[in-house]
């Protein structure tokens, strides 16, 4: 069974440490999809992943004195329905910041 172009869906998963950069990238992707007559749903926010690192402050003793650092990974999903070849070309030519990780599934 082959799916026609009207039934296809592109799922774009975005990850970044900076929420503002992630939202700007989502806006660019949605604007690109809208200009090529494809319907975009999203951005759908996913839960933020927190990774906490615990480090001893002193190099020798004083195990009671510790310092905590954390990284937060913000994630979003955008679904693009009924994409055309023009939509895919426009998405490939899109210039996004280097701090945003993009994963595309067809």
UniProtKB/Swiss-Prot annotation:
Record-annotated membrane-spanning stretches: none
A molecular-function term among this protein's GO annotations: tRNA binding
InterPro entries assigned to the protein according to its UniProt record, in alphabetical order: Ribosomal_uS10, Ribosomal_uS10_dom, Ribosomal_uS10_dom_sf
Cellular component GO terms held in the UniProt record: ribonucleoprotein complex; ribosome
Claim: Ribosomal protein is one of the keywords in the record: yes
Keywords: Ribonucleoprotein, Ribosomal protein
SMART domains on file: Ribosomal_S10
Protein name listed in UniProt: Small ribosomal subunit protein uS10
A GO biological-process term: translation
Organism: Prochlorococcus marinus subsp. pastoris (strain CCMP1986 / NIES-2087 / MED4)
Function: Involved in the binding of tRNA to the ribosomes.
Known partners and oligomeric status: Part of the 30S ribosomal subunit.
Family of this protein: Belongs to the universal ribosomal protein uS10 family.
């Amino acid at each position: 069974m082959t799916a026609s172009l009207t039934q296809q869906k592109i799922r774009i998963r975005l990850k970044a440490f900076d929420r503002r950069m992630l939202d700007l990238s989502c806006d660019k992707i949605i604007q690109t999809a809208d200009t090529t007559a494809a319907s975009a749903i999203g951005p759908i926010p996913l839960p933020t992943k927190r990774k906490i690192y615990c480090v001893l402050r002193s190099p020798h003793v004083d195990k009671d004195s510790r310092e905590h650092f954390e990284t937060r990974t913000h994630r979003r999903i955008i679904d693009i329905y009924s994409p055309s070849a023009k939509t895919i070309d426009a998405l490939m030519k899109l210039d996004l910041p280097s701090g945003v990780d993009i994963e595309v599934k067809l």
